[in-house]
């Protein structure tokens, strides 16, 4: 869709967040919009008085518009090249680009790079994109073109890991090349990453600094990594002197990847338990000085969190009942490293 884009007008006084450069426009702030707008259409946002506030992607949802620019622009290849160039320059500034010890990094992190609804992860010479909204998905071909330009054609595979519902008419997920996996380095450790079959874009890149932080506390400890996936935290623990590491995950595919990562890093004293985490915790007789608990999203929405809470209980009781057991499988002076996403709002 080229200029001119359909126009959406805000209610009086609702432009304050936009003037403060917040990219989300909620549906309740809209006063007037064309009747035939479809999910993913590009729109020009106007104030109540008709002042141009920005250009964004429209959706019939609570977040009605996600702004990609705070001016009137055309979302052509020049726009995308500039956005991706800015993102790459930032990664160069923090020494992630052409880093021999870390060959995987997040190039685009949604709102943080001014591209709400888009994730792009780089694995060596491969790029995996993930569109979280239909409007971004509709730009995937031009995003791939811009990636090729910004990286001077050095990206050999571009894979689209967006949700299945966005794809129509047997569209290919491969926008360039056909590689399904890669062996990458992160802070000197080697990992097998499979974006074709794996979770998210193949590896939880956003946990890189947490993995490095964890390595400061593992020396000579017995470590358990729950919901271990491909063993990212386990490798860091092993290579920083842990006495032993147990990884637990119900996925046999994750078990294969984790064991492969152990071999890639010449690590020892590791055992993978392919079973339900809570069953394992009830049955294990081991004692651990350091727990890593990075579970899947049990409840992404606040109402789901409320429904998961029984009267008088806490998340600690629900997710980690063995911590309150009379059998101390977490050492009394042990460390619990956990990462939970609960969304926003208050929980009664």
Descriptions of predicted regions:
Residues 1-122:
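Non-catalytic accessory regions of SAM-dependent methyltransferases
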Residues 108-121, 137-204, 212:
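Non-catalytic substrate-recognition/targeting regions of SAM-dependent transferases
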Residues 178-348:
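Rossmann-like S-adenosyl-L-methionine
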Residues 78, 82, 86-93, 152-170, ...:
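A short, charged
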Residues 67-75, 128-137:
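Short histidine-centered catalytic/ligand-binding loop motif
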Residues 125:
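Divalent cation-coordinating acidic motifs and surrounding scaffolds
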């Amino acid at each position: 869709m080229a200029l001119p884009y359909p126009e959406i007008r805000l209610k009086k006084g609702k432009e304050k967040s936009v003037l403060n450069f917040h990219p989300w426009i909620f549906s309740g702030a809209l006063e007037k919009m064309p009747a035939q707008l479809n999910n993913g259409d590009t729109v020009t946002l106007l104030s109540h008085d008709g002042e141009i506030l920005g250009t964004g992607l429209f959706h019939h949802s609570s977040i009605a518009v996600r702004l990609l620019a705070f001016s009137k622009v055309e979302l052509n290849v020049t726009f995308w090249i500039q956005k991706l160039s800015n993102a790459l320059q930032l990664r160069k500034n923090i020494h992630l680009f052409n880093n021999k010890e870390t060959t995987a990094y997040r190039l685009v992190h949604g709102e943080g790079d001014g591209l709400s609804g888009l994730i792009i992860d780089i694995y060596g010479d491969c790029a995996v994109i993930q569109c979280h909204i239909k409007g971004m998905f509709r730009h995937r071909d031009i995003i791939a073109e811009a990636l090729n330009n910004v990286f001077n054609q050095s990206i050999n595979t571009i894979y689209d890991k967006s949700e299945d519902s966005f794809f129509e008419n047997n569209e290919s997920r491969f926008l360039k090349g056909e590689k399904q996996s890669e062996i990458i380095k992160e802070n000197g450790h080697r990992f097998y990453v499979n974006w074709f079959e794996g979770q998210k874009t193949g590896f939880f890149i956003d946990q890189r600094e947490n993995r490095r932080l964890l390595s400061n506390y593992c020396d000579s400890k017995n470590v358990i990594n729950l919901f271990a996936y491909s063993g990212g935290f386990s490798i860091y623990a092993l290579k920083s002197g842990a006495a032993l590491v147990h990884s637990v995950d119900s996925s046999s595919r994750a078990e294969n990847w984790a064991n492969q990562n152990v071999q890639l890093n010449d690590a020892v004293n590791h055992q993978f338990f392919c079973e339900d985490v809570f069953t394992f915790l009830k049955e294990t007789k081991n004692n651990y000085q350091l727990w890593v608990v990075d579970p899947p999203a049990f409840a992404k929405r606040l109402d789901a969190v409320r429904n998961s809470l029984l009267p008088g209980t806490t998340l600690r009781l629900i997710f980690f009942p063995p911590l309150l057991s009379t059998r101390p499988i977490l050492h009394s002076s042990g460390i619990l490293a956990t990462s939970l996403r609960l969304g926003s709002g208050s929980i009664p």
